[in-house]
Regions:
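Sensory modules in modular signal-transduction proteins
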Residues: 10-35, 39, 43-45, 89, ...
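PAS/LOV-family and closely related PAS-like sensory domains
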Residues: 52, 61-107, 115-117, 121
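PAS-family sensory domains
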Residues: 120-130
Length: 150
């Protein structure tokens, strides 16, 4: 495989990136420094139930359970101030999230802070997957194990 560093290569890379963003089954969401949604892919629509038109420009509170918001925004501000997460690079975070219909789901995600051309923090991108079924299976297994110990 060769790499064309010219315009054709840039166009091909742009087309490839757009295809990945639009066809990923995982939610890919980008938000600005204030936590307003800048990008919302079809995977995010599938997982959370909001289409892009509903999500763009909205606060991430859209998908964050109310009692977790203060903690979320504390971490978000830390990343925006420092450019680094308290979690290691590539670590999966597991948290509850909200769907449009109000149901809680469990998601795993990674975050990627992004900067502008001047090196200033501009926002955060996240790749998320719904792990609700796996979380519920683990909870059921723990209950069964606890019941057998009694």
């Amino acid at each position: 495989m060769t790499h064309d560093a010219g315009k054709t290569g840039s166009l091909a890379n742009s087309t490839l990136l757009e295809a990945i963003l639009q066809t990923s089954s995982e939610a890919i969401i980008a938000s600005d420094a204030d936590g307003r949604v800048l990008f919302w892919n079809p995977g995010a629509t599938r997982i959370f139930g909001f289409d892009a038109a509903e999500a763009l420009g909205q606060s991430l509170d859209l998908i964050i359970p109310e009692k977790l918001r203060a903690r979320h925004w504390q971490g978000y501000r830390h990343v925006m101030d420092t450019g680094q997460s308290r979690y290691g690079e590539g670590d999966l975070l597991s948290v509850p999230a909200l769907r449009k219909d109000g149901t809680r789901i469990s998601v795993e995600f990674t975050i990627v802070p992004f900067r502008n051309a001047s090196g200033q923090m501009e926002g955060i991108a996240a790749v998320m997957r719904d792990v609700t079924a796996r979380f519920e299976e683990l909870r059921a297994l723990r209950r069964q194990l606890a019941a057998k110990k009694e």
